[in-house]
A protein has these predicted regions:
Chain A
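Generic beta-strand structural signal
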Residues: 2, 54, 96-98
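Primarily extracytoplasmic ectodomains and periplasmic/lumenal surface modules that are beta-strand-rich
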Residues: 11-13, 43-44, 107-109
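N-terminal, Lys/Arg- and Ser/Thr-rich interaction peptides
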Residues: 1-18
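Internal, well-folded beta-alpha domain core
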Residues: 59-215
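Residues in well-ordered beta-strands of folded domains
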Residues: 5, 55-57, 101
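Glycine/small-residue-rich interface belts in oligomeric ring/scaffold proteins
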Residues: 17-79
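Sparse, context-dependent recognition of short Cys/His-centered cofactor- or disulfide-binding micro-motifs
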Residues: 12, 22, 41, 83-87
C-alpha cells in the first residue's frame, strides 16, 4: 500500500446530483482520486487499473465558501448564444490537505500496477509522459503539492488524526468509485463512512473502496 | 519525459471591484472566500481566461472574439472542425484553453441514449485569483447621475444612490502548462508573453482599472508534475511589499530546485529578490523573466520560437 500526500489550495468535489447549487463533498470521492492518480502517471485509459483500491483521508477541516459563477450548458447553437450560460452558486473548499491511500493487490489489469507506477513516477519523474495540470475535480482546482508519504513527509504528519472514507455496509456516505460522464447509467458508488484514523498508519486494505465499473 | 511550466503571479497594488457577486439591495458585492482563516476577495479563473483570450488575439487570430457592439462572443469555427485533421487550421485560444461541446443524454439510464462530447482539454490551466490581503469591508457610497440608470430610477429625476464593495489589494494566481501537448508549440511562448502583459481582468463597467500585469512572478520549468509554488506570495505590510516565506521554505527543504526557477520582480532591490538571490534563484525584471522562461521552454522543446 502506498500513501500520497496532496494539497489543493482551492477545490470543489462536486456532488454528482448537484445542479443549481453546486455543493461539494467534504473530500474527493475515490473516483476523483483514481483519476488524479491516472493523470499523475500519464495513463489515459481509465479502465487500465480497475480493481485498484483508493481511499482519501482528509487531514484538516477546510472552510467552505460560496461564490457565484458562470455555469455553461448548451441549449442553443452556436456556443456563444445567449441562454447558454447562467449564474449559479458553487461551494468552494480552501486549503485542502489530503492523504490518498492506494492498494493495487486486487487489480485485474496488466503489470505494472498503478501502485508501482505511482512509486516510479516519484522516483523518476522524467520517465513519465503525461500532460495537463494535476487537479482534483475541476481543472481550475490545481493541485499544489504531491509527495510520497514516506520518510520526512510521513514524519511531518505523524500523530495527526485524519478523516478517512472507508467502506462500511451501513455507512452514511455514498461516493462514486466510477463516473459515467455521458449518461449516468454506468456510475458506481461505494458506501462508507468518514472514520478518524491516526497517520501515517495505513487502514486495512479490505476497507479501501475498490474502483470498479459496470460490465 | 514531460515538460511542465508552472507559474505564480502577483499583481500590483490597486483598488479592485472586480468580479462581482450577487447584488444585495443596492450594494454591488465582491466575490469572497475564506482563506487562511480570513475573508479574502477572489477573481475567477474564467475572468482571467477571458482577458487572456483578448490578449492572445493580438498575437494570433482567436476562435472566440468578443464583440463590444453585440456584447457577446463571435465564433470563427464553433464546431472546432479544424481539429479533425492533422493539417487543419486551429486557433490559438482553442489550442491553449481547450473547448467542449457537450450534448446531454437523450434518455438517462440506457446506453442507447447516451450523450456525446467533443472535448479538447486545456493545455494551459489557470487557478482562481485570491487577494493577498484580507478584505476589511470597504464600501464606497456613490450616486448615479439623474437619468443615468433609468431602470433603477423609478420616478422623478433624483440621483440613484448605490454602494460598491471595493478592495485595495493585490491578487495572486497560478498556471500550469504542458507545452508539448500544443498543436503549434510556438504558442507556449505566446501564452507566457500574454500572461506577463495581461491588462484588465474582470472590472466594474469600466469604472475601475485593475492592472493584472504581474508585479512579481515565479516561473518553474520542470519535469515534476506538481507546481509546489501555487499561492506562494504573502505580505507582511498589508500588501505594500511582497514576500514569499513559503518559497524559501520549499527551497530549504529541497522540494524546489533553484535551477528550475525564474523569478521576475518590478523592484530588483526588494527583499523578495534578495532572499531568492541568496538561495541561488535567478532574479530578473518581470519582462526579462518572461523572456528567460520562453528561452528555456524553446530550448527544452527544441522548437523554433
Amino acid at each position: 500500500m502506498l500513501g500520497v500526500y496532496v494539497t489543493v489550495p482551492v477545490a470543489c468535489f462536486r456532488k454528482g446530483m448537484a445542479r443549481e447549487y453546486l455543493e461539494t463533498e467534504p473530500l474527493p470521492p475515490p473516483a476523483t482520486c483514481y483519476g488524479f492518480l491516472l493523470s499523475f502517471v500519464g495513463e489515459t485509459d481509465r479502465r487500465r487499473h480497475v480493481g485498484a483500491r483508493v481511499a482519501p483521508v482528509l487531514l484538516n477541516k477546510p472552510p467552505t465558501s460560496v461564490v457565484l459563477r458562470t455555469v455553461w450548458r448548451v441549449k442553443k447553437m452556436p456556443l456563444g448564444s445567449p441562454g447558454n450560460t447562467r449564474p449559479d452558486y458553487q461551494q468552494l473548499l480552501t486549503d485542502v490537505k489530503l492523504v490518498v491511500w492506494l492498494d493495487s493487490s486486487a487489480e485485474s489489469g496488466t503489470e505494472p500496477t498503478l501502485e508501482a507506477r505511482v512509486r516510479a513516477a516519484f522516483t523518476h519523474p522524467s520517465s513519465v509522459n503525461r500532460f495537463g495540470g494535476l487537479s482534483l475535480g475541476e481543472s481550475t482546482h490545481l493541485v499544489d503539492e504531491v509527495s510520497l508519504l514516506e520518510g520526512k513527509k510521513a514524519d511531518s504528519i505523524s500523530g495527526q488524526v485524519g478523516r478517512a472514507f472507508l467502506l462500511a455496509p451501513k455507512g452514511r456516505l455514498s461516493l462514486p468509485v466510477w463516473v459515467d460522464h455521458v449518461g449516468s447509467a454506468g456510475t458506481r458508488y461505494a458506501t462508507g463512512s468518514l472514520e478518524e484514523m491516526t497517520l501515517p498508519t495505513p487502514p486495512s486494505a479490505d476497507r479501501l473502496p475498490i474502483i470498479h465499473h459496470s460490465p | 519525459m514531460s515538460l511542465h511550466v508552472f507559474a505564480n503571479f502577483v499583481t500590483p497594488f490597486g483598488t479592485a471591484a472586480n468580479n462581482r457577486a450577487e447584488t444585495e439591495g443596492n450594494i454591488t458585492t465582491l466575490q469572497k472566500l475564506l482563506w487562511q482563516g480570513e475573508t479574502h476577495s477572489t477573481v475567477s479563473a474564467e475572468a482571467i481566461r477571458f482577458a487572456l483570450r483578448r490578449r492572445l488575439g493580438a498575437a494570433e487570430k482567436t476562435n472566440r472574439v468578443w464583440d463590444e457592439a453585440l456584447r457577446s462572443n463571435v465564433w470563427q469555427d464553433h464546431q472546432f472542425k479544424g481539429w479533425a485533421s492533422e493539417k487543419g487550421v486551429t486557433f490559438v485560444d482553442d489550442d491553449l484553453l481547450g473547448y467542449m461541446i457537450a450534448e446531454a443524454a437523450k434518455e438517462d439510464g440506457s446506453d442507447d441514449g447516451k450523450g456525446s462530447a467533443t472535448v479538447r482539454r486545456a493545455v494551459l490551466e489557470i487557478t482562481r485569483a485570491v487577494s493577498l490581503t484580507p478584505w476589511a469591508g470597504d464600501v464606497t457610497f456613490n450616486a448615479a447621475s439623474p437619468g443615468a440608470t433609468p431602470s433603477a430610477q423609478k420616478k422623478g429625476s433624483n440621483p440613484v444612490p448605490y454602494g460598491t464593495e471595493v478592495h485595495a489589494t493585490r491578487y495572486q494566481y497560478g498556471i500550469a502548462l504542458t507545452p508539448d501537448r500544443l498543436r503549434d508549440k510556438t504558442r507556449a511562448a505566446k501564452a507566457i508573453d500574454a500572461l506577463c502583459n495581461l491588462g484588465t481582468v474582470a472590472g466594474n463597467h469600466g469604472r475601475f482599472l485593475f492592472d493584472f500585469s504581474p508585479d512579481a512572478v515565479v516561473l518553474r520549468v520542470t519535469q515534476d508534475p506538481a507546481p509546489r509554488l501555487l499561492y506562494c506570495f504573502d505580505t507582511t505590510d498589508d500588501g505594500k511589499t511582497v514576500v514569499s516565506p513559503k518559497l524559501l521554505q520549499r527551497l530549504a527543504a529541497e522540494d524546489l530546485d533553484p535551477k528550475e526557477l525564474i523569478v521576475g520582480v518590478s523592484d530588483l532591490e526588494c527583499k523578495l529578490a534578495a532572499d531568492l538571490k541568496a538561495r541561488q534563484v535567478p532574479v530578473y525584471g518581470v519582462k526579462k523573466a518572461c523572456e528567460e522562461a520562453v528561452k528555456r521552454i524553446t530550448a527544452e522543446l527544441k522548437i523554433k520560437g
